[in-house]
Amino acid sequence: ADRAMELLKSLSTDSPWLLVFNTISSHIPFHNYPEAFAEKPDDAMVRYRNAVRYTDKQLGRFFEALSTRPDFENTVVFILGDHDTPVDSVDYLVPQPLGLSASQIFIGIFSADSALFNGLTVREDVASQLDLGPTIFDLAQVREPNHFWGYDLLTQERPAGQPSVFFSQNSYYLGFRDHVLVGGLENEDVYRAAAGGESPYTLTTETADLEWKKRAVGAAKAV
């Protein structure tokens, strides 16, 4: 939080600002918190909980610093991950299941301005990080056309029957579930391509598997 708080001090309180900060303290394999804060045993679940506690503490420090600014009530904070991970399965860097469900992972949106949420209702449809761009534009009262695939979660409804698209680089899977089209690649595919190898879409010789991957790309373009 020290670096984020330093950047916060440099921002004007009289004009709009955007601060994007990426932390790796809770990133797998959960070795990125200080040893002075907690031990780092072989048990990945213990490290995971330590990493989450450390991240939570640092977020608290950041919010305390933010709350002292005169523009605090005009500020909206989004907290999200840089990508998904199959938390309910064995990950490539943590050789043990973490015992978590993906349904326990949320994107947090915080604001001290209670009027911001007046009149809003709970929505049960699918939302994702693709929707954050349009939503932030709405909160900032930017009414210009934009290139985002997503929808403004505060004012727009997703067209009925239109599937959402979810891609994961981890553990390739693809299919329809609750009107959501999901797909991804094996880790080996991703790393091989990143190292200059073949494209992930040409690696498989199994016709059915290749066809499903093509459908995923086609669905993404359609949305």
Predicted segments with their positions:
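Solvent-exposed soluble domains appended to multi-pass membrane proteins
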Residues: 1-223
